[in-house]
Amino acid sequence: MAPPSVFSEVPQAQPVLVFKLTADFREDPDPRKVNLGVGAYRTDDCHPWVLPVVKKVEQKIANDNSLNHEYLPILGLAEFRSCASRLALGDDSPALKEKRVGGVQSLGGTGALRIGADFLARWYNGTNNKNTPVYVSSPTWENHNAVFSAAGFKDIRSYRYWDAEKRGLDLQGFLNDLENAPEFSIIVLHACAHNPTGTDPTPEQWKQIASVMKHRFLFPFFDSAYQGFASGNLERDAWAIRYFVSEGFEFFCAQSFSKNFGLYNERVGNLTVVGKEPESILRVLSQMEKIVRITWSNPPAQGARIVADTLSNPELFEEWKGNVKTMADRILTMRSELRARLEALKTPGTWNHITDQIGMFSYTGLNPKQVEYLINEKHIYLLPSGRINVSGLTTKNLDYVATSIHEAITKIQ
């Protein structure tokens, strides 16, 4: 008699919610269906958009006979790493001028977070510091908790961020939680376009956050997934990161080029490391090289080449900025239009938070029962938290979505 499968005791894992939502949407035959759950940009025709500048650079790469498919270095394409870090920190960054910046090409923003988390678990402020508290915002992107847990961190906590009652930032709660955090705790910060709330601190509020973090010796780990995509302005979206440099912080910054280049399936990311002196950066990168070697060994080239070629060419860079602004402007327009329709319908509650928020996502304030109603009765797909992808709205479905939200709120408490 053959023994049972060695996999017979493996439990079925829960599906990843946002991808399950998209699968359900695809299978729904209803012609009215709207997908507000997907974490990717859509045009006004509800299609993915390949940026014109990306098409141009892809053609240029395809025609370059000097290129081949040899392995990239373990830390990635050098031109990409330097261009990516420069984009985050700015051309005039004192950290760049003083050569105390390093970069690691990664598999998207998630890969950058994981390499950073693995390094911190091994080497942060000593060795083997898996008991160091890691703070993430409440709420945050669900992968933040999972990545730091998988890296071995045992004490993951949340800091207050979203005030559900006023539908905005709970600054005082945020600052109080930072004040009470043990010294040298790791704080995960959203650089701009906070996911899922779309609510960002103002520059003045960032200054207060930095002040508390400085005197409590807290370590910032920025997640920058939307630079340029949030406001349409690269500098504005990197303001917090650059301010922390000016205040003398050492920090990590996980960068993603999925959204602002539309390179979702190329997995293009970078981990920017800012230290106090060049020597420590070299040592940090030497250890990160060891971590990358046992994780993916060498990163893929295509997406990194597209980004590096674009950022290093003044003409292509300007064209890319225009493409990014096109996406950001469409999202801003959809925010205004949705708010105007809800207010015209006299939908209960206030709706200014929709236009106060920024970036791809909006935290609507809808509760799980109202979300369930929208999915089951109206075929409008969104997360149970009430988060919507604003770029899923179009001139063709806005009226339907607004009246459906109005109906959900007036019918379901």
From Swiss-Prot:
It is an enzyme of class 2 (transferase). The keyword Ribosomal protein does not apply. GO terms for biological process: 2-oxoglutarate metabolic process; aspartate biosynthetic process; aspartate metabolic process; glutamate metabolic process; glycerol biosynthetic process. Its EC number is 2.6.1.1, 2.6.1.3. The modification N6-(pyridoxal phosphate)lysine is found at K259. L-aspartate binds at G39, W141, N195, R387. Its cofactor is pyridoxal 5'-phosphate. Keywords: Amino-acid biosynthesis, Aminotransferase, Cytoplasm, Phosphoprotein, Pyridoxal phosphate, Transferase. The modification Phosphoserine is found at S149. Transmembrane segments: none annotated. It catalyses: L-aspartate + 2-oxoglutarate = oxaloacetate + L-glutamate; L-cysteine + 2-oxoglutarate = 2-oxo-3-sulfanylpropanoate + L-glutamate; (2S)-2-aminobutanoate + 2-oxoglutarate = 2-oxobutanoate + L-glutamate; 3-sulfino-L-alanine + 2-oxoglutarate = 3-sulfinopyruvate + L-glutamate. It is found in: Cytoplasm. In eukaryotes there are cytoplasmic, mitochondrial and chloroplastic isozymes. NCBIfam families: PRK09257.1. Homodimer. Belongs to the class-I pyridoxal-phosphate-dependent aminotransferase family. This is Aspartate aminotransferase, cytoplasmic. It comes from Macaca fascicularis (Crab-eating macaque). The gene is GOT1.
